[in-house]
Amino acid sequence: MSSRKFGLNLVVVLAIAALFTGFWALINRPVFAPAWPEQISGFSYSPFRLGESPQKGQYPTDEELRQDLEQLSKLTDSIRIYTVEGTQADIPRLAEEFGLRVTLGIWISPDQERNEREIATAIQLANTSRSVVRVVVGNEALFREEVTPENLIKYLDRVRAAVKVPVTTSEQWHIWKEHPELARHVDLIAAHILPYWEFVPMKDSVEFVLDRARELKHQFPRKPLLLSEVGWPSNGRMRGGADATQADQAIYLRTLVNTLNRRGYNYFVIEAYDQPWKASDEGSVGAYWGVYNAERQQKFNFDGPVVAIPQWRALAVASVVLAMIALMVLFIDGSALRQRGRTFLTFITFLCGSVLVWIAYDYSQQYSTWFSLTVGVLLALGALGVFIVLLTEAHELAEAVWIHKRRREFLPVQADSAYRPKVSVHVPCYNEPPEMVKQTLDALAALDYPDYEVLVIDNNTKDPAVWEPLKAHCEKLGERFKFFHVAPLAGFKGGALNYLIPHTAKDAEVIAVIDSDYCVDRNWLKHMVPHFADPKIAVVQSPQDYRDQHESAFKKLCYSEYKGFFHIGMVTRNDRDAIIQHGTMTMTRRSVLEELGWAEWCICEDAELGLRVFEKGLSAAYAHNSYGKGLMPDTFIDFKKQRFRWAYGAIQIIKHHAGALLRGKGSQLTRGQRYHFLAGWLPWIADGMNIFFTIGALLWSAAMIIVPHRVDPPLMIFAIPPLALFFFKVGKIVFLYRRAVGVNLKDAFAAALAGLALSHTIAKAVLYGFFTSSMPFFRTPKNADSHGLLVAISEAREELFIMVLLWGAALGIYLVQGLPSSDMRFWVAMLLVQSLPYVAALVMAFLSSLPKPQEKAAEPQQA
């Protein structure tokens, strides 16, 4: 690399690094808020630490309680507790040691026996402990509909009669307005005003609290007002404009407590310490209302500017380091990239690095159980995998569009003096329409080449009416053509091709293979065989192409999808001598083929042979020009079966050649070849892994519908990577097809639609490939009739089933929970986007059911 190019690259990398660092700084701009006062009115205090939970009967020790009370006594002289169950009954006694006043809580629930125990204990404590200054009978018991107003009033009257301190119940502010009769049975109004739960943005929340307080004072002028819960969570899902972040918690609380102090309100900040156990009752946000975390560490600064992520500088550095590592890998052997391609890759890499660091940081702020930790690790690994796939996709895009010139171009050789040895063309067929195969043989007979033979093998076709016409046609075409009918013959297509090798003419130096539906250009051998003059070349490959794209809308979409595979992926792979050998329009040096043979164990014997050629240190040549056109599948089920075979075969090859591909063990594969074989099939593997994401999304959505108050939508950060990959892949297809293939926008979207329709099929093939060792060879039928609509839809029944599940999950969440928050809307949108490949499959199935023009013409006319 020249010093000028290196300098330019360095400037670009530094500029983009500065851009993303600037973005980290932008979203972490300091915001000023009043300093925390020396004393606040009070804290709501639940004493549980990590690993402790009242639901499991796990209570803190007296020593732990003392540590908490000592810490809180430095900020307030008043605490509120919610129950006297377990060791919480010791809090009034211990609070006396630190001069703390206690608002004692009695937890009222549908459990009558527990209610009686709570009331008895609370009365005893209120009458014997100097620290108890008031008693609260029930906490949001009416709001939860766990007690009737009449029964709550009975409890209130009983406790008021039994104690000397003021008695009240604590409810959300609107419950007091709905049940004003409660005021006659309490000594003060204790109201919760929590703007977060009411979708109020943080910036409007202080005024919201003051307005509600004024309303209550106006409605109950003779009763003292206690704001028994005011607060803001530091983590959790958004509710409308209310965002649960540490920065918003800090700004809101620092502003609110100063305002309430100035105006003389009595209040309790909910809460002193984070309570992870509450997540099971209130959703994930329930764990994060503390001013201190569960380890008793202060969560935000009490003075000075508030920064959203105090550690943002370290995170920015980490994202830059991560991006630089990935970039160094992507730029290996990248000298052919133009500057625009390098800039594009640099930007995408820094974007991925920043998002990955953000995901890791955000998840690190969660309280984890073994279950959530396991899920989080799996999701994190999934996110890492998604970004690896995204980077490989971006790398392919850059090398397809922004490159100075192709490194290895194999143009047609037209010179008469060129090297043109004898060629043996092998045509395998099984149960193929005779008239179609005759067209293939006629095209071979018209080849403009001095010395070649054609060997046709029909293996295992049972009906003589199918193979005997081919035998007769070969005899008619002359001595160049030889026909073999062999039954039984094991090994599918690979077995048939292996059978022909010893029957090949002794003086043939090249063996060519075409499928039985391909009509070749007369110049195919003349233009391409001369490339074997290079002794290192073992394979010469021409792209697959098709001639029936105008027969139907279905085939037009299939044709658009095929073009990218053969005119984008193979072209970029050819630059590093890493093409995937196709089973048609391919030529192999005879000596190499005799040594290696076709792998009968592999369902994609062609691609497997090509890899073994590379492992021997030999090369392949790929031509851009089309020299033959075949027929595409006629139905969606056949289209799926063909792609299933390709994807299943890819996994077979990866498993069988893992040592060579992953470590280069026992082979002469270059790093570029290993990269392309792994990276090229990585998107298919990602499709396979996406099945697990879809299953997980459906299970999680079901939980959100069944227990909506306990299960929140997953963290948005984990839904972003698969969505980003989906839209990037679709955008990449559209962009590449327009730039590299030269098709119009309509055909580019057609390619994207056809590709999406195969996602489920590929996913199944990948999973079958990893968990099975072999499957039968799927022959792609030719000249098949279209199926009816119901048959076509039944061929996509799995896709239809999953689509209905995803749509049902989205609808169920909407009906049960609504769309109150951005993360809820995002999750529902994610479910709908996840359904798009399945919708595409149904569209393709429908199009394949439409009659082809010749079928329409054959229909009887109505009188």
Explain the meaning of each model-derived region.
Residues 34-37, 48-50, 54-57, 238-246, ...:
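Aromatic-rich peripheral "rim/lid" segments of glycoside hydrolase catalytic domains that contact
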Residues 335-388, 415, 683-776, 792-863:
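Membrane-embedded multi-pass helical conduit in multi-pass membrane proteins
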